[in-house]
Amino acid sequence: MNITNVRIRRVDNKDSSSKLLAYVTVTFDDCLVLHNIRVIRGQKGVFIVMPNRRTKVGEYKDIVHPINQSFREILQSAIFKEYVKENPANFELELV
């Protein structure tokens, strides 16, 4: 499965304490689209959060997620590459 498109929707945070940097849409093989991946700045660096929902008991469950670490790294790399390309001056890449 190939990543054929990555679209970044940056979040302009006026509140510097906000950790959300962007929402991402990824297209696979020009036939499957995954919306609402989030780019988050944490204490240890930047990482992605897969789309999730809150259950009735308050837990968050991923709707979709990579099955193995190698695909997660491919996905994260493609997202960060596009993010940096769109915003080179204001992004210090420290991956988690």
From Swiss-Prot:
Organism: Borrelia recurrentis (strain A1)
Homology family: Belongs to the SpoVG family.
Matches recorded under NCBIfam families: PRK13259.1
Keywords: Cell cycle, Cell division, Septation
Function: Could be involved in septation.
Keyword Cell division: yes
Highest rank taxon of the organism: Bacteria
Pfam families registered for this protein in UniProt: SpoVG
One GO term of the biological process aspect: sporulation resulting in formation of a cellular spore
Protein's UniProt keywords contain Cell cycle: yes
Protein's name according to its UniProt entry: Putative septation protein SpoVG
